[in-house]
Regions:
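Metal-cofactor-dependent catalytic cores
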Residues: 1-228
């Protein structure tokens, strides 16, 4: 198996950027979801309720500054567009704590499951796409670990999918049947919720090895519970 794609979403709930290589730290891919949208009451706003955000793209500049459609995230133009979508006083906020993730820091998809899904895999918003995986083999991975060079990733469970899968990433047209199909054929779950056990650098093409057994279980427990 190998890494086919690496994705980062610097602005939570907007479209992301495809990378050739990335640093993986304890909170996932460096620079992922470091900015989010808040409404006038300070609540986090996502494309589940405001899908127009999917039509904007978040990236990082060479110096690590978040951009929205190529513009500084603090610019007046970006601020106006955010309020136009999410309402008066809605704004972008920078925050890099663990709470910025809906579930876990990494979402891993596989080519076999994507083929079974049969639609644009960007609807799944993965961080990593792993190639060389037969069919729905990923569904047997929870409890295991993925070794990518120096990086070790723990696989917790399958991701329960939400309404965002219904939106075409290019046209933003909503097709509820796609989300219904995920629930009908895959019990509502596609791709894997993962966390980082050992940090390091990864790149497209890197070999990925699935590990199981005691060593993986001990590493997983240490990462989750802080055990020595």
């Amino acid at each position: 198996m190998n890494i086919m794609e690496i994705w980062r979403y610097p602005v939570k709930t907007m479209a992301g950027e495809r990378l050739q290589r990335a640093r993986v730290d304890p909170l996932g891919i460096e620079g992922d979801r470091v900015v989010h949208v808040e409404d006038a009451q300070g609540a986090v706003v996502t494309s589940r309720s405001h899908p127009r955000f999917l039509g904007h793209k978040g990236t990082l500049s060479p110096d690590g500054e978040p951009l929205v459609d190529g513009r500084p995230w603090r610019s007046p133009e970006v601020a106006a567009e955010v309020m136009a979508i999410a309402g008066p006083r809605a704004k972008l906020v920078r925050y890099d704590g663990v709470e910025r993730f809906d579930v876990l820091p990494l979402l891993v998809a596989t080519d076999g499951a994507i083929a079974a899904f049969g639609h644009d895999h960007r609807r799944l918003r993965p961080n990593l796409v792993i190639g060389g995986v037969e069919g729905l083999a990923e569904r047997e991975w929870p409890g295991g670990c993925l070794r990518i060079g120096k990086v070790l990733i723990g696989v917790q469970d399958l991701r329960l999918r939400c309404v965002m899968t219904a939106y075409d990433p290019d046209t933003l047209v909503r097709d509820k049947d796609i989300t219904r199909d995920i629930y009908r054929r895959f019990d509502g779950k596609l791709a894997l919720n993962c966390f980082v056990i050992e940090a390091g650098e990864i790149a497209v093409g890197d070999e990925v090895r699935l590990a199981r057994g005691r060593a993986c279980a001990e590493s997983t427990a240490a990462a989750v519970f802080g055990e020595p």
